[in-house]
């Protein structure tokens, strides 16, 4: 059963899917150290070009997510946090001119702090399928009008891991895309449109091997409306984010990925407006 904690709205019953859809305000420039993170990598002298040949087969990732939300009222500042991690297996196969994919989640764990409602038990495994082509990722599930927060989170992971990549790039190369993702906030279906800008920073030495560093900058607009108990709720959000991709230089596969995002959320219910600031970060690490 969902509950109200005073004026604290149940925004983060799970990690907000559309807040994790994109890659927060940390400066993405190479060479700047971020607090609490390892020093920024040093670019090699190579300027490319690098050519990619997409690889079929199976790879696995451990994905950790952290989100915090803050509401400032006249009387107090209220903060909550939630963390989760998943182990996801991603398989790619050639299907004509496109690639088909299957993502399987066999581990999903949630840790909450504060007034956030404990997450429901997740039935495992979770499987999503779809295809990857010139038009980007096409997801066969979840449906846009569904409200399965966990499956929507996994769908967002796929958009992060299977980001578009030109067949050949050089240092300084830039490209853009726009993706639409579907999430679930407190039982309210949400739709987010994310505009992403990719820039090739160059080759770096990472874990004693050369990888290609690609930076991403995002802007997000999200909307949702529906019933929460006896209340009509409207959710709106705008945010900005960054991401750092460490890619295999031969295949373009993701070896490691870090995303950060800061989102301003407004919730209207029963004629009252509530404002929140949400910060999220994700770390994707390939484990096989």
Model-derived features: positions:
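C-terminal motif of bacterial Sec signal peptides marking the signal peptidase cleavage site
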Residues: 18-19
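Bacterial N-terminal signal peptides that target proteins for export
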Residues: 1-9
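Short, conserved catalytic or interaction motifs in soluble domains
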Residues: 22
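Signature of exported/secreted
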Residues: 27-288
């Amino acid at each position: 059963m969902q509950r109200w904690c005073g004026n604290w709205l149940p925004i983060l019953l799970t990690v907000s899917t559309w807040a994790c859809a994109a890659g927060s305000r940390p400066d993405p420039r190479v060479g700047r150290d971020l607090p609490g993170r390892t020093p920024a990598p040093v670019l090699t002298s190579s300027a490319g070009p690098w050519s990619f040949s997409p690889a079929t087969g199976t790879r696995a990732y451990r994905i950790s997510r952290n989100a915090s939300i803050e509401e400032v009222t006249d009387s107090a500042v209220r903060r909550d946090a939630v963390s989760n991690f998943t182990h996801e297996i991603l398989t790619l196969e050639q299907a004509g001119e496109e690639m088909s994919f299957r993502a399987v989640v066999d581990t999903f764990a949630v840790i909450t702090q504060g007034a956030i409602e404990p997450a429901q038990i997740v039935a495992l495994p979770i499987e999503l399928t779809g295809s990857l082509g010139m038009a980007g990722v096409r997801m066969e599930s979840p449906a846009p009008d569904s409200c399965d927060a966990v499956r929507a989170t996994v769908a967002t992971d796929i958009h992060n891991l299977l980001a578009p990549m030109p067949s050949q790039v050089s240092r300084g190369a830039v490209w853009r895309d726009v993706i639409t993702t579907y999430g679930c906030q407190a039982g309210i279906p949400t739709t987010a449109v994310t505009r992403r800008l990719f820039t090739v920073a160059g080759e770096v030495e990472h874990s004693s091997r050369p990888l290609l560093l690609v930076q991403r900058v995002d802007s997000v607009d999200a909307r949702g409306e529906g019933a929460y108990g006896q209340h009509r709720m409207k959710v709106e959000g705008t945010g900005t984010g960054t991401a750092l991709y460490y890619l295999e230089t031969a295949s373009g596969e993701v070896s490691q990925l870090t995303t950060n995002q800061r989102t301003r959320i407004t919730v209207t219910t029963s004629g009252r407006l509530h404002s929140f600031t949400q910060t999220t970060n994700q770390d994707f690490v390939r484990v096989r």
